[in-house]
C-alpha cells in the first residue's frame, strides 16, 4: 500500500486552473476504422503532425485492445515532445485515460500524477484522482481528493446529478463510481488541512 501511495501527491486546497492540454489528441478527423488508421499511418510517414498522428494511432490501438502496441506508440509520441510542454501534457492525459479504460488503474494514476507537477492545479485532477483511487480500493485517499473538488466548487460537486454536465465525456459507469465517492464524502467529509 505505501509504495502505491507514494505515486500520488496529497491534494491541495483548491484546483481552479483550466488545462487546455486535457483534450483528445487528433491529427485526422472524419474517418473511422481502417480508413482512419491508413490516414494516420500516412500522416506519420509524411511527417505532418507526426507526433499527433502517433498519439491518435496509439489511442486507436488501445481502444482496439492492443495495449502493447498502444503503449509503444504513446511512448514514441511522448519521446518526440518536450517534457512538460502542451503536447506532452495532452498525450500524457490521453494515455492515462486509455490505461484507465484498459483496467490499468494504477498505471493511469501514475501517468496522471506526473501531470500534477507539470500543470499545477487543473480542475480535472480531483475528480479523476478520486475515481482512480476508488477503483484501486484506496477509499480514504479517494475521498480526500474528492474533498478538493468540493472545496473548489462546492455548489457543483455536492450533487451527483451534476456529473453528466461536469463530466460529459466520462462513461456512465465512471460517473456512477464517482457518485459512490461522493456518498463516502457526504458520510464523512474530511477536514482541511
Model-derived features: positions:
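Conserved positions within tetratricopeptide repeat
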Residues: 71, 109-110, 140-147, 175-180
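Terminal, low-structured helical/coil segments at or just beyond the last alpha-helical repeat
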Residues: 8, 151-193
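Charge-rich, solvent-exposed alpha-helical interaction surfaces
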Residues: 36-39, 53-56, 73, 111, ...
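Alpha-helical adaptor scaffolds
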Residues: 25, 56-126, 148-151
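Flexible helix-coil transition and linker loops at the boundaries of alpha-helical arrays
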Residues: 38-47, 79-86, 156-159
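Short helix-adjacent coil turns
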Residues: 31, 65, 103, 137-138
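Short N-proximal segments of mature Sec-exported proteins
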Residues: 123-137
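N-terminal leader/linker segments that initiate helical-solenoid repeat arrays
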Residues: 3-56
